[in-house]
Amino acid sequence: MQIQGQIVDIENKRIYSGEITIQNGKIISIIEKNHEVKNYILPGFIDAHIHIESSMLVPSEFAKIAVLHGTVATISDPHEIANVLGKKGVYYMIENGKQVPLKFHFGAPSCVPATAFETAGAIIDSEEIKELMASPDIYYLSEMMNYPGVLFDDDEVLKKIAWAKHFNKPIDGHAPGLRGEPIKKYISAGITTDHECFTYSEAQEKLSLGMKVIIREGSAAKNFEALIDLLPANYENMMFCSDDKHPDDLILGHINLLCARAVAKGIDVFKILQVACVNPVHHYKMKVGLLKKNDAADFIVVEDLVNFKVNKTYINGELVAENGQSFVENINFETPNNFNITKKKISDFEIPSLAEKIRVIEALEGQLITNEIHHNSFIKNGKLVSDIENDILKMAVVNRYQNTTPAIAFIKNFGLKKGAIASSVAHDCHNIVVVGTSDEEICNAVNLIIKNTGGICAVNGTQNKSLALPVAGIMSDKDAWETGKLYQEIDAMAKDLGSTLKAPFMTLSFMALLVIPDLKLSDKGLFSGNTFSFVDLNVE
């Protein structure tokens, strides 16, 4: 097979008319040849850090959409499913991903559960990390979220890091806001990347210390604008990622969109493509071709180097997408789960008033971090309830692995004027998280999730919309387009109920993630990410 076009040689920073010859999935020659073909041929895009589960799609369904946007490979951390099903979940993702052409490169989840302050469905200890790291299907140790464990020399954390070093595999970081001496110690442990930088100066400091910074632009956390100006001077040590991407967003685009935005800022296209296509391959030793002789024939054909509209995507010489049509085949897959609770009562979500002021989680648009604010208690019949007028809404986290009392808190900036929204996609333990305007609506939303053994929903009286997620309670058994359509309908209903957030369900899913400050809620209670300890709802 031969393909002609304008060859984009990223390494040598040149573009020339050429012809590529492919045989048995490999490039056997690239020659300069004059022709009239104007399309550009370049290496495929790579998402350098993504939790496939956040798309609510199994890997084989994720692949169908990703290849349309020129994505040929991912660096994927399966810690979402691992928190539900343990290493069995990791192997599920690997085996499902092997059945399609897209090149998934999975890591061994380093923090399952993320902390000891929440209930997960499984534990992956250092012995299981050893087993996973020994596998040729595991390419790295996934993000080390337990940075206090690194800083204070936790024995189990250090053993996990040691096994990654033993097998000569890179270690991913997760250190939002970590600066000065703490970040120096964190890096000295052997941790090489961070995708959690949310300010220019933070990323600049980490780059200066030898860390590779991954610019993240997902459905909830959006750090592109804050960090992109670092790329021209640091392009050899940066990558792009989405981290968490909901299905409706994935349908619109992937890493290709970040390339287009970077070009629009006047950044050199070769530097952009080094970040988007090349750096992940070298850092993670990926089995992905870079448009060189004898490489795997992984490349894309785009209309131009401005908008990066993808005409064709090839993986191992196979045409997997063309002009908006995906050729990734349907795969039959199982739906393993871990959901063990019975329906809740309205009284389960009632809480007495004990103080004039309460701690409130302030959610922030486009960020995973939150603020802690204090607000006057809103009381009815001696009970703390949602203060709809001031947008201080009741929130709960319900343990889905065993019947326990829900943990209750209050949250600002969800904006609901009626009803409730709930999800069993709740990083990282994936218990049920819910925000609502009344205890009754909260209870109804939680019980709908329980009925579906996982999913997302919006409820308002007798009205409700839901998307069932029967694969570990976090992924759909439907295809990407149907899942995306249902998600859009529920997202629209959440906004009809008053939510002003751009992605209310994505933001909701991070309100139980304790490793990102300031204030979060686990199934065990209200938690300060700054002091790494539980705090009381009531302010004394």
From Swiss-Prot:
It catalyses: adenine + H2O + H(+) = hypoxanthine + NH4(+). Pfam families: Adenine_deam_C, Amidohydro_1. GO terms for molecular function: adenine deaminase activity. Its EC number is 3.5.4.2. The keyword Coiled coil does not apply. SUPFAM superfamilies: Composite domain of metallo-dependent hydrolases, Metallo-dependent hydrolases. Its cofactor is Mn(2+). The keyword Hydrolase applies. Keywords: Hydrolase, Manganese. GO terms for biological process: adenine catabolic process. Belongs to the metallo-dependent hydrolases superfamily. Adenine deaminase family. This is Adenine deaminase. It comes from Flavobacterium psychrophilum (strain ATCC 49511 / DSM 21280 / CIP 103535 / JIP02/86). The gene is ade.
